Amino acid sequence: MISSNDFRTGTTIELDGAVWRVIEFLHVKPGKGSAFVRTKLKAVVSGSVVEKTFRAGEMVPQALLEKSKLQHTYMDGDEFVFMDMTSYEETRLTAKQIGESRKYLKEGMEVNVVSWNEKPLEVELPNSVVLEIKETDPGVKGDTASGGTKPAILETGAQVMVPLFISIGEKIRVDTRNDSYLGRETQ
């Protein structure tokens, strides 16, 4: 159980048999009446967002999520197959469960799979990944670090804005949280 006073962004709770993640919260102390906590909750499974108000100090069941490090091995139709590299046990997730994470997911990548009651819910990517540029406009002589950007398509199909001097075939580091270019990767 967790008190509504202890809610923070990212806290997971159980309501009506589902797992919800707190995405916004506000402690309100009106002039009259008792204090309350106004929250915006996102369903981990369906992605729907609702607003809910809790009394200050109200106890709510906390959802205890398990994270396990798995490797994305292959696609099977519409399902992504992950393998635990110690037990060789397979876990399957649908494209809907993976959501926006799929644009950075490539075979052989290790990710955290979040489970609740031994049922996989979602994938947590690392904060940054290294991917190869598959398609972008060619660089022109004189395109240095002047601050300009151009769109580039990565090997996974994701599109990010990169500096003008980046060309096809180069490996770059991308921030998976905000789809931004972090730098060239030299190997």
Swiss-Prot record:
Chief location: cytoplasm
Keywords for this protein: Cytoplasm, Elongation factor, Protein biosynthesis
One term of GO molecular function: translation elongation factor activity
Compartment annotation: Cytoplasm
One of the record's GO cellular component terms: cytoplasm
Extent of the signal sequence: none
Biological or metabolic pathway of the protein: Protein biosynthesis; polypeptide chain elongation
GO biological process terms held by the UniProt record: peptide biosynthetic process
Highest rank taxon of the organism: Bacteria
Family of the protein in this entry: Belongs to the elongation factor P family.
Role summary: Involved in peptide bond synthesis. Stimulates efficient translation and peptide-bond synthesis on native or reconstituted 70S ribosomes in vitro. Probably functions indirectly by altering the affinity of the ribosome for aminoacyl-tRNA, thus increasing their reactivity as acceptors for peptidyl transferase.
HAMAP family named among the record's database cross-references: EF_P
UniProt-recorded name of the protein: Elongation factor P
Organism: Prochlorococcus marinus (strain NATL1A)
